[in-house]
Every structure is written in C-alpha cells, then in structure tokens.
Amino acid sequence: MRLDKFLVSTGCCTRSVAKKQVRAGAVTVNGRTPRTSDENVDENNDTVVYCGKTVVYRKYTYIMMNKPEGVVSATEDGRDKTVLDLLPPDVRTKGMFPCGRLDKNTLGLMLLTDNGDLGHRLLAPKSHVTKIYRFRSKFPVSEEEAKRFENGLTLEDGYETKPAGIRLEGDGNQGYITLVEGKYHQIKRMLEALDNKITYLERVSFGPLTLDGELERGEWRYLTDEEIAALEAHA
C-alpha cells in the first residue's frame, strides 16, 4: 500500500496533507524517513510514525460531520449537494455512505462510513439507536402535549410512534427530543400532530456519538479509536 494512502486510512490526515508531512520529514517508517509519499508500506507489519505518534491501519473509514442546511443525506443527487460532496475526493472512499438520514434543512451530527456491516446494524429497527435533537417550535409545547409525546403519537397516516423523550426549555418552544426510531420527517410530523411547527432542528447525538462542538457547519473529522469502539459495542 502506498504510504500516503496508508496515512489517510489511519484517519490522521488527508492525502494532500500526508504528502506535505512526508516531504517535511514528519513521517518515519520503521525508523527511516521516506523520501516520497508514494513508496509502499506493509500496513500489517511496518511501524509508521506520523508527527511523533504511531498510527495504525484502519480497514474502514469513519467520519463525523456537522451537516449544514441545504445539503442532502445521500451518496449522490442530481439536483442538490450531498454530504459526500463536502468531503475531499481522496477521503470519499468506495462504498462510503451516510449512516442514517437528516432532512435537507436539518443540521448537525452525521456519521459517514464505508463499513456497510456496522452501518446496517446501527440502522436496523431492532437496534433502537438513540438520537437526540435540539429543536425550536413555532408555538410552546405544553406539559400535556409533552406527555403525549412521551406516550407515543398517532401521525397523519395512522402510524403510532414509539415513546419519545422531550425536555422543554425556555418558554416551552425549544428543548431536546429523543427518538429511538427514524421515520420520514418524524419530528416535523410529530409536532404537526400537536398543531405545531418545527422552526429549527439539529441532531446533537447518534448512539454513543456526540456532535463535536469544535466542528463548524460543513466541517468534518475522523472518529477516534474510542468512538469507533463505542459504535461497535452499541451495534
């Protein structure tokens, strides 16, 4: 495997950054400083140190993104920009997909991976992965309406939602909603069942992952080893 490709696989940098760091002498392979980033390394046996830290090959790529408004949760779209379009070409690995969906105008935490097995396990209905959203609504949500939320609501098509958590803040027109399912436009439709309307929606957690507060809208980072292990355990 090429050294720059190996470095990208570890989640430490993009390919362009890898090339710069190799040229700067910030990378060693088995104690030797390589001249170029296109030389081959053995991903299973060689010891690679990047900027003073030993890095290990990852078979799969895992990315946390702070999804901005107006971007769709899809691998490709003929009309709108997708979450994959926000990644550099060398980071968009074959088979990468958004794990779960956020509506076009919903913001926040999006998990992207090329690990199809893990993704499908996390998205399986029986997994009941908890998702927390920060919301604002047009009208205040009353305590009685909050109880209806927590007991499950009947949507306009007759679907009975699973019990959902809701924590109200301020005047009751904002707070946090917790779901264990992910039906199409679910929170929007649940508020509409209360004759209310969502004016702002942002996902702040997905299972064991919490949105990194340092990520600006449209920014992304690789998951840490600890976050990957937590996802595996959760699935």
Name every feature range the model reports, one short phrase each.
Residues 1-235:
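Basic, flexible Lys/Arg- and Gly-enriched helix-loop patches that mediate nucleic-acid binding at interfaces
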